[in-house]
């Protein structure tokens, strides 16, 4: 596992760490390290990532506590959920599971772009962090770094050293959007297992809810009106508007090699799972926790 293959080194004694990429994972990792007063150089290909404003992340209570304490306070960005209800395609006639814990917070939803912007702003003003566009001249200097952490699946380092992986394609595609609706007490997440695939309603405020629909057979996507499906399966909200749909392919992967010399693979480059489990970014936070404690 990652924990057993991380370099045998005390990271707090390293003078400088280089992080490749400026994804949400890369910035989260960088912020955790600069908080330990470790000098971090971030090398990236694209200066401005075009982050979808319809993408959201579910974060567990324990990971939120760690994030607030060790990385940055994200409480103002969170929408706390106290219950999860799971239905079959029959909806109210067949509720499969009901998760709740004495009216306490189970997990929280945060919008990707909001979290990204606050991390980017804090790192830009941090004396321990230096951001720079990656070019071929930087390749030779990577070997001189004490530790390089690669979070970018698209760069030349990935293609050269981290191309061997075990991949599972689901022939599925996730569609995301935000619905705007009348104001309600909105602290319950809904998951409906439709015939076409799971449909999630994830509250982000009292009048907005994030939608994630995973289409089981992507070849059939042209036959399905996803906006109509959302309206048909919705039994809770008085919808005013459905934002433009965005989508991405679903697959899982694990690298065969987690590191090369002084370069460590990290985040989605290292391992990726189906978002239905809700563990993608939660796994990343747990990996950051382990790495920071070495």
Question: What role is predicted for each listed range?
Answer:
Residues 65, 78-175:
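Conserved N-terminal helical subregion
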Residues 20, 43, 149, 267-268, ...:
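Active-site flanking residues adjacent to catalytic metal/cofactor-binding acidic residues
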Residues 1-14:
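N-terminal amphipathic/basic-hydrophobic helices that include classical n-h-c signal peptides
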Residues 151-235, 242-245:
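Conserved FAD-binding catalytic core of PHBH/FMO-like flavoproteins
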Residues 219-293:
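FAD/FMN-dependent oxidoreductases across multiple families
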Residues 17-82:
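Glycine-rich FAD cofactor-binding loop and adjacent beta-loop-alpha segment at the N-terminus
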Residues 25, 153-156, 279:
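Short glycine-rich anion-binding loops that position phosphate/pyrophosphate groups of nucleotides
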